[in-house]
C-alpha cells in the first residue's frame, strides 16, 4: 500500500448535482425548485423564524428570566478539588494559582461534593452547611 494508490471506499463519494442542465438530467428547466413562488426566485428565502407575517413563536411566548451579571465573578469549588490541593490553607489566591477558578472570580464557595480526609483551613471563602460539617469533621476550620 502506498499513498499514491489509496482510493476512497466504493460508494463513499458522490458527484455534485448539476442543476438546470437539460431535461435528461432530471434537474433541468426549473432545477428542482418547482414553478413560481418566492422560493423559486433568486434570493427568495425568508429569515429564520419568519412565519409569513404571522406573529412568530419567539414573539408570542413571554420573556423569562435574566442573565446574571455576577455569574462570571463567582465560582463553586468542591471538597474533591480541595482534597487534591497540597496547601493546608486555602484562599481565593491559592484556588486561582491552582487553576480551579478563573482570574476574573471575586468570590468562591465551597460545596459538599466528594470527601475531605485531611485537615485544611479555609480563609475568605463561603461554604455550604454540608461542606462546613465535612471540613470540621476532618479536623479543619473555616476562618472568615
From Swiss-Prot:
Keywords: Ribonucleoprotein, Ribosomal protein, RNA-binding, rRNA-binding. Residues 21-31 have a biased composition (Gly residues). One of its GO terms (biological process) is translation. Gene3D superfamilies: 3.100.10.10. It comes from the Bacteria. PANTHER family: 50S RIBOSOMAL PROTEIN L15 (PTHR12934), LARGE RIBOSOMAL SUBUNIT PROTEIN UL15M (PTHR12934:SF11). Belongs to the universal ribosomal protein uL15 family. Part of the 50S ribosomal subunit. Binds to the 23S rRNA. This is Large ribosomal subunit protein uL15. It comes from Cupriavidus pinatubonensis (strain JMP 134 / LMG 1197) (Cupriavidus necator (strain JMP 134)).
Amino acid at each position: 500500500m502506498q499513498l499514491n494508490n489509496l482510493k476512497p471506499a466504493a460508494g463513499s463519494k458522490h458527484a455534485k448535482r448539476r442543476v438546470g442542465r437539460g431535461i435528461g438530467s432530471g434537474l433541468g428547466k426549473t432545477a428542482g425548485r418547482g414553478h413560481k413562488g418566492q422560493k423559486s426566485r433568486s434570493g427568495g428565502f425568508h429569515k429564520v423564524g419568519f412565519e409569513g407575517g404571522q406573529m412568530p413563536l419567539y414573539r408570542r411566548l413571554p420573556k423569562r428570566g435574566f442573565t446574571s451579571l455576577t455569574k462570571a465573578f463567582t465560582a463553586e469549588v468542591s471538597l474533591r478539588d480541595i482534597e487534591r490541593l497540597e496547601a493546608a490553607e486555602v484562599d481565593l489566591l491559592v484556588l486561582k494559582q491552582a487553576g480551579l477558578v478563573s482570574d476574573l472570580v471575586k468570590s468562591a464557595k465551597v460545596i459538599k461534593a466528594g470527601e475531605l480526609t485531611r485537615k485544611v483551613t479555609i480563609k475568605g471563602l463561603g461554604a455550604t452547611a454540608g461542606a462546613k460539617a465535612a471540613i470540621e469533621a476532618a479536623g479543619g476550620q473555616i476562618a472568615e
